Amino acid sequence: DVKAEPSRAFDSRSILLYFLMFVFSLSFKPDPEYNVYTRFMKSHRCYDLVPTSSKLVVFDTSLQVKKAFFALVSNGVRAAPLWDSKKQCFVGMLTITDFINILHRYYKSPLVQIYELEEHKIETWREVYLQDSFKPLVSISPNASLYDAVSSLLKHKIHRLPVIDPLTGNTLYILTHKRILKFLKLFISEMPKPGFLSQTLEELNIGTFHNIAVVHSDTPLYAALGIFVDQRVSALPVVDENGRVVDIYSKFDVINLAAEKTYNNLDITVTKALQHRSQYFEGVLTCRANETLKAIINRLVEAEVHRLVIVDEQEVVKGIVSLSDILQALVLTNGDDGKTT
């Protein structure tokens, strides 16, 4: 029911060749800064990001939901492709968002066991969740460009994109915003520096500055899950009575409920739930709206986080800037003739 797929190794020589060809092509442009990141993404394939070795967990849709989430925890992964044995193909992804949706949909009280989580199979949950709406799996070929991958991630508002070999039907890797930005950062020092890198978030209007979803220390966990479901955000800054950020509760933190087997009591506060973090937490990573895009990119990549909380001098929350915001700005907004795709 749970299996690991071997991933193919990428050829480092081919990556170097692609990059040299990309740099060579820049010398023939009247303005070497023009569309630099867009052209970089168009000159590299998804295959170039497939590591020599990585863990890929695949679930059969006949697996029990509870076992699947426990398997995510034990394997240290955030999502898994779903294989339908009847159709003999991949049909979707199981993510932490599914776990949140199940908990929020079926939770009643600490005294009532969540039967649907305990007994439902993945295929049963998909039938309930999707109902009559058909949502095909969004995937990409290893030979497709990284530009196509970024476009697909942003267009479909997804965080994980399976790279599937069209010949074998095997899933080779799961592409994410983080992995793509990290790959770009490897080469960014060798590329021309566009002027917009020296502009601030405020000047470029990058990030979300209005209707920021936040929670307080005493917010019930069930209410926080409701915000995740209704507003489709991936993290909630935890603020004090003055609006100052004191912590952050992300979708990834919710999986700790499975790890600790504490998902039957969602009446506890967000603060109480955060005490169950499985990893060391160094604090909320923040930035200011007057910091440059270059500084923001460096901080995101070096800290390996998905977002920064934008604060003012008093640490009051003013916005959020995410990896998807950055890729949108680098590759699409400032990449295609200054137009947003």
Language-model features and meaning:
Residues 1-341:
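Tandem CBS (Cystathionine beta-synthase) repeat/Bateman regulatory domains
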